[in-house]
C-alpha cells in the first residue's frame, strides 16, 4: 500500500494540537479509500453491494440556547461508496469543538454533523444522536451471519494479497453473510492497530451476470431487427426503446370468428390435405365452410373463439366434431378410399382442437400474468411504505440502519419483479395472438 501519499502529509495525527473552543468544521480531515483499495484492485468495482463504516461516539456534548450542557451518544454510518474515510484524530477534535457551542436542539446538532461529515467523506453519511437514557436498557447484540473466527485453519501470511479476491469474479453465484470479530487495521501514520467487528454480506455476481445476460439478449434482438431491415453493423438502427412499463398492451379480443385459426400453418396444411381428397373442392366448399366461416361449421354452437373455449370439455381439451365432412355426406365427391379420407378428416379435426386448446392455454397464461402484475404492484406499494417507515424510525433514532437497508433492498427487489411481470404480460399476450395466427380488431 502507498502510505506515503501526499494526502497524508497534512494530517494532524501524531502531532501536538490545540483543542478548539468553538465548533469548527475545518478540523475534519479526509483519507482517500483508494489508498487501500487500489492495491486490492477494487477501487472501481467493489466485490460487495452494501456496507458501511459504523462509528459510535460516546462523548458528544454541546450547549443549548440557555448555555446548559447537553450530552448524547452518536451512531455514525459512513457509506462504503464514499470517496474518503475520516481520519480518527481529526474526527475527535471536530466532535470536541461542539462542547462550548450553542445549538437549538438535538436535530440541529445531528443535521450539522451529517452535513459536515458528508462533505468531508464525499459520500453518504448518516448521523443519529441518542439520549443517554436510551442506553439504560440497551443490549449488546450479536451480528447476524456465520462467524468465521473459529475455523480450524492454518494461516502463514498476514499481508495484503489481491489474489485472495479472485473468486469474486468466478462464474459461480454465491450468497452468504459472514461475521468476524478479528478485523484489524493499522493506522496509516502511527501503525497502531485498531480492532473491530466486520460483517460482510455478499451477493457475488448475481446482478452482474443478469445484466450481462440481458445485454446479450438485447444484442440478439437487435441482430434480428437489423436482418429484417437489411442494416449493416455500422449503420444506425434508429429505434427508440420505451420503458417497458410505458408499453401498452393491445388487449386480447376473443370475440372473433373461430375461422381465424384457419390462418395457422398447421391448420392450413391439414385443410389442404383434406381438400385434396375431393374431386371438386368448390362443390363442397359451401357446406364445408359456410360463409367461409369455420366457426359456423363446428358441431359446437360456438361462433367465436371466446364462446368456443367455454364449451364442455373432456380431459381438459375442447372436443370438435365436423358432421358435414362425414363420409356418407361427401363420398360422392371423394376420389380416395374411405380409410384415407377418414385419416385426413380426423387429422383436420385434431388440428382444429389443438389450435383452440392452444388459444385457451395462452389466454389463461395471459390473465394469470395480468393478475401477477397487479399483485406485485400492490406489494411494491406496501414495500415503499415499509421502507419509508423504517427510514423515519432511523431518523428518529429508534431503529437501526440495517433495518432500513433491508427494507430498501426488499423494495428494490419488488420493483425488479414488476418489470419481469410486465414482460411476462407482453409475452403471453403475443402468444395468444400467435396461436390465433394474428391480431384481429
Curated annotation (Swiss-Prot):
Cysteines engaged in disulfide bonds, as pairs: none
Gene3D superfamilies per UniProt: 3.30.1130.10, Outer membrane efflux proteins (OEP)
GO CC terms, sorted: membrane
One term of GO molecular function: transmembrane transporter activity
InterPro entries (UniProt xref): GTP-CH-I_C/QueF, OMF, OMP_efflux, QueF_N
One Pfam family from the record: OEP
Example GO biological process: transmembrane transport
Protein family: Belongs to the outer membrane factor (OMF) (TC 1.B.17) family.
This protein's name: Uncharacterized protein HI_1340
UniProt organism field: Haemophilus influenzae (strain ATCC 51907 / DSM 11121 / KW20 / Rd)
